[in-house]
């Protein structure tokens, strides 16, 4: 069952800590996946259609912090890399957003400083697309970057690759 990151975190990390001996909680934990983690499992089981209609070119991908914390791996990159004539460069650095950190007056400058290394890498890459699994992180980096209007969600690009505009 693909779910958003907060739901997944609650079901696979928080609830099992609160109710470690509850078998129903363990069943729920085993049933939750990050969307690209789920798609990767389908691909490994030869159940994911990979007859993509369009290539995506050069993609800069900011790996969301929650994915590193949840040990998901780079499944988003792996799935998008299945698309012909598509290169995905993963940037595993902090966006500096952290919920409200980037929008609070007292922490905004620190947030920008934290994001700078990632923004530089994205600027240097000159991507056709910029993505992040975290909408807030993606928009923060896109706003700070030289030539990006906005970030795209990886699912949006996958939809484009399948020809479902």
PLM regions: where:
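C-terminal structured "cap/appendage" subdomains that terminate the fold
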Residues: 99-154
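Short connector loops at secondary-structure junctions
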Residues: 37-39, 86-108
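Peripheral docking tails and interdomain loops at the edges
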Residues: 16-21, 25, 33-49, 141-165
């Amino acid at each position: 069952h693909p779910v958003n990151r907060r739901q997944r975190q609650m079901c696979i990390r928080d609830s099992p800590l609160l109710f470690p001996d509850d078998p129903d909680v363990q069943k729920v934990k085993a049933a939750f996946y990050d969307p690209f983690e789920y798609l990767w499992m389908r691909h490994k089981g030869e159940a994911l259609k990979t007859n993509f209609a369009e290539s995506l070119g050069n993609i800069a991908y900011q790996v969301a912090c929650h994915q590193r914390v949840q040990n998901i791996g780079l499944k988003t990159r792996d799935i998008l890399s299945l698309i012909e004539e598509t290169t995905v460069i993963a940037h595993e650095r902090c966006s500096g957003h952290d919920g409200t950190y980037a929008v609070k007056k007292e922490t905004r400058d620190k947030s920008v400083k934290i994001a700078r290394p990632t923004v530089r890498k994205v600027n240097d890459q000159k991507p056709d697309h910029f993505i992040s699994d975290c909408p807030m992180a993606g928009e923060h980096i896109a706003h700070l970057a030289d030539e990006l209007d906005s970030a795209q969600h990886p699912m949006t690009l996958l939809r484009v690759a399948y020809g479902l505009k």
